[in-house]
Amino acid sequence: PRLGRFSRDGSPNAIAGRKRPLHTIIPAFLEKDQVRIAFGIMGGWNQAQAHAQFVSHIVDFGQNIQAAMETARFTKRTFTGCDVELENRVAGNVRAELEAKGHKLTMRIGFSDDFGGGQAVMRDYAAGVNYGASDPRKDGAAVPELVIKEWGK
């Protein structure tokens, strides 16, 4: 429901004057040199975490936007505790390391829509190429189109 994301007293997200609720309507943009990426990943509580994971897979690991969208995800659904939900595609050694650090893991089947779903578009101005990515966790598709010559060029 609208305005349903406030929490009761005692919570960091409790309703109060001059406050705004934690909310996850967050389209995002990345830019470096001649490359622009616009993306969004829906998924409620998981949305900001999925955004950060998507960006990390591009920036830190050099993945293309489709690979970054498909990479196994994890989420922390609460402010407290050590519970972490993971897609079962997360490598076994990573799961073992998390458990050794005291995390309580809940496994979800691969490409679970519990971890949101998103789309991304990328424009490489230097190459004159557009790219698209669609998350297999939801219904959607990245459909290729001809690049239209930019105005004035």
Language model region names:
Residues 63, 83, 88, 92-153:
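Terminal-appendage/accessory-domain detector
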Residues 1-112:
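Proteins synthesized as precursors that undergo proteolytic processing into mature forms
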